[in-house]
Amino acid sequence: MSAVSREGDDWILRLYIQPKASRDLIIGLHGDELKVAITAPPVDGQANAHLLKFIAKQFRVAKSRITLEKGELGRHKQLRISQPQQIPDAVAAALG
């Protein structure tokens, strides 16, 4: 499975998360995943909450339209985004 795929109006992102980074950024492809740096530490769900907020802002959707499907406790995650209003350049490039 590739880093970015589509199922109807939903986008599926396979992510590799780098917590405690200096800034929030979608870095680009990292193997078969998209690497995303976030400033939040991986403690008590802070990184997941921050990731969802950051991705929601990047795709211009409500946080409620993003589902963390896999990887709640690890760096490798899978997100489903329902009907994004905007596609960030790094994500569009990964889609090909």
Curated annotation (Swiss-Prot):
One of its GO terms (cellular component) is cytoplasm. Transmembrane segments: none annotated. It comes from the Bacteria. SMART domains: DUF167. InterPro entries: DUF167 (IPR003746), YggU-like_sf (IPR036591). It holds the Pfam family DUF167. Belongs to the UPF0235 family. HAMAP family: UPF0235 (MF_00634). This is UPF0235 protein NT01EI_0281. It comes from Edwardsiella ictaluri (strain 93-146).
